[in-house]
Regions:
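Bacterial N-terminal signal peptides that target proteins for export
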Residues: 2-15
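Classic N-terminal secretory signal peptides
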Residues: 17-19
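C-terminal motif of bacterial Sec signal peptides marking the signal peptidase cleavage site
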Residues: 22-25
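Ser/Thr-rich, low-complexity intrinsically disordered terminal regions
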Residues: 27-151
Length: 151
């Protein structure tokens, strides 16, 4: 019974986080919508000579916004966490950015907004937060513009 109560409480907390992301996302995207994509997640195609150039821009973008880069699961993926509250928070927002090689010096960036419970513990769990998709789409567009302007 206690586990169910915790799960319901956790869902309520993530609903608040998702609502906050949706509100912020609507302000940061042009029309508040995420275009239909191959992956079903926010994505853009960036023209760049190397994955290294793209990774530098992604890292700079997120760290300048208070995100902490964390170890990713794969070489073509970057993960960034931001505590839900200042101090020792057990919840965090996570953005996963997958980088896929396309043709002719281009790279597809796929962004996935996540909520993390038990952040920085052995028992952390991730939950996708689709309400944050419009904000992540706007982030990816800005990263694309920065990379392509630097060429």
């Amino acid at each position: 019974m206690k586990m169910t109560k915790t799960s319901v409480l956790g869902l309520g907390t993530w609903a608040v986080v998702a609502l906050a992301l949706a509100v912020i996302g609507c302000k940061s995207s042009e029309d508040g919508k995420v275009p239909l994509t191959q992956s079903g997640h926010p994505e853009v195609v960036v023209r760049a000579k190397s994955a290294g150039d793209v990774k530098v821009a992604i890292r700079e973008f997120f760290t300048n916004r208070g995100y902490i880069e964390t170890d990713s699961r794969a070489t073509n993926e970057m993960m960034f966490d931001k505590p839900a509250r200042s101090g020792r928070s057990v919840k965090a927002l996570r953005v996963i950015v997958r980088i896929k090689k396309e043709t002719n010096d281009s790279w597809r960036l796929i962004g996935i907004p996540m909520g993390v419970d038990g952040w920085r513990s052995d028992l952390q769990t991730e939950t996708e937060v689709p309400q944050g998709a419009s904000q992540i789409q706007a982030f990816l567009v800005e990263i694309k513009n920065r990379v392509e302007a630097g060429q």
